[in-house]
């Protein structure tokens, strides 16, 4: 048996005592009174802040939203199935923030900025609050640079500028997501960082969008933030703010960003669910009273930075879904009043084969021609008016039996104008090609063709112009003006291509 040496034990104990550091920690704790439906009521937590993160005993995180006299209402950022009544909760002293870095480009993440694409972790050296204040009046400047969507109907008649907020609104299945994703595809090579936020959508729809981005090479400058329909309401409510924080990170680094919220109706529904479960008083359509503020504080973060801040920009394209074309419902009217214009997609146009189904008559951009290059202004200046007159005339012509020659030719041209606005999905056009297309239609060069031949002719003309008259593209891209030389080149190309096309059709 080994003898016990008292002096060794004494020295050991003394060493331990000397190493002891007395640390007093005050933790703000509470007790779970009730839990269910993604909401927990907590007794205690006396010094908790509104919006502060709290941590439950089993690891779930929640946000303190309701601060009442005798309890705190917390929304859970997870299922919270293991939380028990009577278990303890501690306040963390932190507001929701996410890590941000360039490494997020090309990744699919959730509302907490955790990767969900199975490609490992994302390194980040700094973090941002997901709810940061919007830029003030002095730190902004007016929108003046165009953000090309690649869609003729938008770029020629409802132009969007960098730093603008343009609402995409329409019924379900009218191609709202397609307009937004085409805009992202068109940013290739334009040094614009894109953030696509999917809120409450089917996982299969999100996967389809991600696949399109990967196939077209758009993922290298895009971040996808996804909270699907299976996610808790809290995370669906947070997802747009996470996307905005990531876009802001790049904007304040003097970069241009484009963010798409698809769609804000689902975020409002998630917020309504949370608010009703927290027993906040319901207002119009059972939405809480601060649902306007929910969207305004998000969309006000989109801006064109002033020269002193480096002229970065964040352009927002929020999407809102309507029920049977009713734009006077609560959420649509709210978002219309916050944004700088709206692109209205019509189910009737979509079903009649006009895609993108943009109703040019009631769509508007409040930034207007300030967000167009001079060449586009010169060519497409009166196209919106022409198209609106044609739509009115067409409605009237349904009841008229004998129409005079002028009316007939106006209707014929209008039909061809409408035809040239049609575009296939994921096939955005460069601004030079758009100018050529609009010029050809407005100046009557398509009048001699059948309506069925218009798209084929324009396709051939684009190829012909690119191959035989490369100077046209050079002039537009360098001067941004539709010069007399450019017009002469285009007229020549149209004439030559028309002759070739007619010969080909006859042959």
UniProtKB/Swiss-Prot annotation:
GO MF term set: ADP binding; ATP binding; proton-transporting ATP synthase activity, rotational mechanism
NCBIfam families named among the record's database cross-references: atpA, PRK13343.1
PANTHER family assigned to the protein according to its UniProt record, in alphabetical order: ATP SYNTHASE SUBUNIT ALPHA, MITOCHONDRIAL
Xref: HAMAP family: ATP_synth_alpha_bact (MF_01346)
S-S bridge residues: none
Site features described as Required for activity, chain residue numbers: 363
Subcellular location(s) per record: Plastid, Chloroplast thylakoid membrane
Coiled coil: none
Free-text function comment from the UniProt entry: Produces ATP from ADP in the presence of a proton gradient across the membrane. The alpha chain is a regulatory subunit.
Pfam families, A to Z: ATP-synt_ab, ATP-synt_ab_C, ATP-synt_ab_N
Membrane topology: Peripheral membrane protein
Major localization listed first in the record, in broad terms: plastid
One GO cellular component term noted in the UniProt record for this chain: proton-transporting ATP synthase complex
Taxon lineage: Eukaryota, Viridiplantae, Streptophyta, Embryophyta, Tracheophyta
InterPro entries according to UniProt: ATP_synth_asu-like_sf (IPR023366), ATP_synth_asu_C (IPR000793), ATP_synth_asu_C_sf (IPR038376), ATP_synth_F1_a_nt-bd_dom (IPR033732), ATP_synth_F1_asu (IPR005294), ATPase_a/bsu_AS (IPR020003), ATPase_F1/V1/A1_a/bsu_N (IPR004100), ATPase_F1/V1/A1_a/bsu_N_sf (IPR036121)
Protein name, per record: ATP synthase subunit alpha, chloroplastic
EC number: 7.1.2.2
PROSITE patterns registered for this protein in UniProt: ATPASE_ALPHA_BETA
Keyword Plastid set for record: yes
Keyword list, A-Z: ATP synthesis, ATP-binding, CF(1), Chloroplast, Hydrogen ion transport, Ion transport, Membrane, Nucleotide-binding, Plastid, Thylakoid, Translocase, Transport
Residues where ATP binds: 170-177
Family from the record: Belongs to the ATPase alpha/beta chains family.
Top-rank lineage group of the source organism: Eukaryota
Catalytic activity from the UniProt record: ATP + H2O + 4 H(+)(in) = ADP + phosphate + 5 H(+)(out)
Originating species: Pelargonium hortorum (Common geranium)
Quaternary context: F-type ATPases have 2 components, CF(1) - the catalytic core - and CF(0) - the membrane proton channel. CF(1) has five subunits: alpha(3), beta(3), gamma(1), delta(1), epsilon(1). CF(0) has four main subunits: a, b, b' and c.
């Amino acid at each position: 048996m080994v003898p016990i040496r008292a002096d060794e034990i004494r020295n050991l104990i003394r060493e331990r005592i000397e190493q002891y550091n007395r640390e007093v920690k005050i933790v703000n704790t509470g007790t779970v009174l009730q839990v269910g439906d993604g909401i927990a009521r907590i007794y205690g937590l006396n010094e908790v802040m509104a919006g502060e993160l709290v941590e439950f005993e089993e690891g779930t995180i929640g946000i303190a939203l309701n601060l009442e006299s005798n309890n705190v209402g917390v929304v859970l950022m997870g299922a919270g199935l293991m939380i028990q009544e009577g278990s303890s909760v501690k306040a963390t002293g932190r507001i929701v923030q996410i890590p941000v870095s360039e490494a997020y480009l090309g990744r699919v993440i959730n509302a907490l900025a955790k990767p969900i694409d199975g490609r490992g972790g994302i390194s980040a050296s700094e973090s941002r609050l997901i709810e940061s204040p919007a830029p003030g009046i002095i730190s902004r400047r007016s929108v003046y640079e165009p953000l090309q969507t690649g869609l003729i109907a938008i770029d020629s008649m409802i132009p969007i500028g960098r730093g603008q907020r343009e609402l995409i609104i329409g019924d379900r299945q009218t191609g709202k997501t397609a307009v937004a994703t085409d805009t992202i595809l068109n940013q290739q090579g334009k040094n614009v960082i894109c953030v696509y936020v999917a809120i409450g959508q089917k996982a299969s729809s999100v996967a389809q969008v991600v696949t399109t981005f990967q196939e077209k090479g758009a993922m290298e400058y895009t971040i996808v933030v996804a909270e699907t329909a299976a996610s808790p309401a809290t995370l669906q409510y947070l997802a747009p703010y996470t996307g905005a924080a990531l876009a802001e990170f790049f904007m304040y680094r003097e970069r241009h960003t484009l963010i798409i919220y698809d769609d804000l109706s689902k975020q409002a529904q998630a917020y309504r669910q949370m608010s009703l479960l927290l027993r906040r008083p319901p207002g119009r359509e059972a939405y809480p009273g601060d649902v306007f503020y929910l969207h305004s504080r998000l969309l006000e973060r989109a801006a064109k930075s002033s020269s002193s801040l480096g002229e970065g920009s964040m352009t927002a394209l929020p999407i809102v879904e309507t029920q049977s074309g009713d734009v006077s419902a609560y959420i649509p009217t709210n978002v219309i009043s916050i944004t700088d214009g709206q692109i209205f997609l019509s189910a009737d146009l979509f079903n009649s084969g006009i895609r993108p189904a943009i109703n040019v008559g009631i769509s508007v951009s409040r930034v207007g021609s300030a967000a167009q290059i001079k060449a586009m202004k010169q060519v497409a200046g009166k196209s919106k008016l022409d198209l609106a007159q044609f739509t009115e005339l067409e409605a009237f012509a349904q009841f008229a039996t004998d129409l005079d020659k002028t009316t007939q030719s106006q209707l014929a041209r209008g039909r061809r104008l409408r035809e040239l606005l049609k575009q296939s999905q994921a096939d955005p056009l460069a601004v030079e090609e758009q100018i050529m297309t609009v010029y050809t239609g407005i100046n009557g060069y398509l009048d001699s063709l059948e309506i069925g031949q218009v798209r084929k002719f324009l396709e051939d003309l684009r190829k012909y112009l690119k191959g035989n008259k490369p100077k046209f593209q050079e002039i537009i891209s360098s001067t941004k003006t539709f010069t007399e030389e450019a017009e002469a080149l285009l007229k020549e190309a149209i004439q030559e291509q028309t002759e070739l096309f007619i010969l080909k059709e006859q042959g």
